[in-house]
Amino acid sequence: MLQRVILIVLDSVGVGELPDAYKFGDKGTNTLGHVVEKTGIKLPTMEKLGLGNIIPLKTVAPNPNAIGAYGKMAEKSAGKDTTTGHWEIAGLIVEKPFPTYPEGFPKEIIEEFEKRIGRKVLGNKPASGTEIIKELGEEHIKTGYPIVYTSADSVFQIAAHEEVIPLEELYRMCEIAREILKGDHAVGRVIARPFIGSPGNFVRTANRRDFSLKPFGPTVLDMLKEAGYQVYAVGKIEDIFAGQGITDSVHTGNNDEGITATIEAMDAVKKGIIFTNLVDFDMVYGHRNDVNGYAKALKHFDERLPEIMLRLKEEDLLIITADHGCDPTTPGTDHTREYVPLLVYSPSMKEGRNLGLRKTYADVAATIAEIFNVGPIHTGTSFLRELPLKVGV
């Protein structure tokens, strides 16, 4: 019987526009396809698993002898953000999109926030995080006022220089914002965005922290935890689920740390799930339209993936997917509404398998629920029985 699932989310690595992408301004987007096309990178490990069988990729070939199961998944939820994507992977469909603020946050929200933190704020508009600290960083240093901004996603972001507003105080401000932002203004995430440096040379640090809404219903993580299984969160997973359904967690500063932490978790978890988010694709490269950086990050993951695969036992199942797109070749810097890849591998698989087009990310949750005999997850369809696993596993 399968005993462990290693679930890795390559944050923002979408594989082509969803049929309704035009409604989100994302017609023609294809994060992975465009990055591969522009850079000519090769991804031999994921090619071996069947990545090139999911969509046509210029320099990643289809593999008739793929050792993994492969397919792509559509997002059923109404959105294209991190919280929505991860919650759906865990079995929760978000039918009403989280609120967004293209004109900035309402006066009453900002006034309440300023009153609670005891100081004014700067910004209060949609902006790129790197651009707004360039624009307002110097004024922030002079005044001590935090920079509040949003994006096309449902986020309330607070940027502050670590020497002006210490991290613990910034995190406290985020907790205050999280308390205020409820009801009609229940944004998906409040995000701390600390930075360092001097005017003209500001750099965001790895001390970002996300303060998510609590999931509005049970996820497969809750079901696993209640049944006594380990749920080991790596990266920002604990934040995305507001700690719900998590038994152990480690926060990481970048993809490399996330991969290493996943490998270390494989020594700590005997029965249960390791759930990893690798954020650099999205945060460092996608939102900054850095195509070459995105390609290097994909290549680096592909080069380190064998370290994980070689540690897999017959009772382990590896699932690699994504939560949305963030096509760095588009003029915009926001997430894109795309299909996500699905790669599944176990040493106990006899051959590769085409898992086709899945109607929802929640198929991952349904599969995990079936493996551990929890649930059921009614929002998705398990693909466990479609996997060519050896008898008795």
UniProtKB/Swiss-Prot annotation:
Residues given in the record as Mn(2+) 2 binding sites: 282, 287, 335
The protein's Enzyme Commission number: 5.4.2.7
Main localisation: cytoplasm
A molecular function GO annotation: magnesium ion binding
Subcellular location: Cytoplasm
CDD domains linked to this entry: PPM
Keywords: Cytoplasm, Isomerase, Manganese, Metal-binding
One Pfam family this sequence matches: Metalloenzyme
InterPro entries the record matches: Alkaline_phosphatase_core_sf (IPR017850), DeoB (IPR010045), Metalloenzyme (IPR006124), Phosphopentomutase_DeoB_cap_sf (IPR024052)
GO biological process, one term: 5-phosphoribose 1-diphosphate biosynthetic process
Catalytic EC class: isomerase
Cofactor annotation remark: Binds 2 manganese ions.
GO cellular component: cytosol
TM region positions: none
Catalytic activity: 2-deoxy-alpha-D-ribose 1-phosphate = 2-deoxy-D-ribose 5-phosphate; alpha-D-ribose 1-phosphate = D-ribose 5-phosphate
Biological pathway: Carbohydrate degradation; 2-deoxy-D-ribose 1-phosphate degradation; D-glyceraldehyde 3-phosphate and acetaldehyde from 2-deoxy-alpha-D-ribose 1-phosphate: step 1/2
Binding site for Mn(2+) 1: 11, 323-324
Job description of the protein: Isomerase that catalyzes the conversion of deoxy-ribose 1-phosphate (dRib-1-P) and ribose 1-phosphate (Rib-1-P) to deoxy-ribose 5-phosphate (dRib-5-P) and ribose 5-phosphate (Rib-5-P), respectively.
Family: Belongs to the phosphopentomutase family.
Protein's recorded name: Phosphopentomutase
Organism of derivation: Caldanaerobacter subterraneus subsp. tengcongensis (strain DSM 15242 / JCM 11007 / NBRC 100824 / MB4) (Thermoanaerobacter tengcongensis)
